[in-house]
Amino acid sequence: MAGGHVAHLVYKGPSVVKELVIGFSLGLVAGGFWKMHHWNSQRRTKEFYDMLEKGQISVVADEE
């Protein structure tokens, strides 16, 4: 009677290449989101100063 063999998972340790790829990918995604935030902030600031220059808005409170 031959007993069946059960496959056991063997922990080989961390995969350096896999860790580097995951870290690089997460860094690129986080950097992309940061750049999008920065571009949006720049656009809003530019729009504000353009409107201020055209006289559409004012930073001085109106006296009533």
UniProtKB/Swiss-Prot annotation:
Keyword set includes Transmembrane: yes
Main subcellular location of this protein, as a coarse class: mitochondrion
Disulphides: none
Transmembrane segment boundaries: 16-34
InterPro entries named in the record: COX5C
Keywords: Membrane, Mitochondrion, Mitochondrion inner membrane, Transmembrane, Transmembrane helix
UniProt GO cellular component terms: mitochondrial inner membrane
UniProt keyword Transmembrane present: yes
Location(s) in or outside the cell: Mitochondrion inner membrane
Other notes: This precursor was imported into isolated sweet potato tuberous root mitochondria without any significant processing, the import being dependent on membrane potential.
Protein task: This protein is one of the nuclear-coded polypeptide chains of cytochrome c oxidase, the terminal oxidase in mitochondrial electron transport.
Assembly information from the UniProt record: Sweet potato cytochrome C oxidase consists of at least seven different polypeptides species, subunits I, II, III, IV, Va, Vb, and Vc in order of MW.
Family assignment from sequence similarity: Belongs to the cytochrome c oxidase subunit 5C family.
Protein name per UniProt: Cytochrome c oxidase subunit 5C
Species of provenance: Ipomoea batatas (Sweet potato)
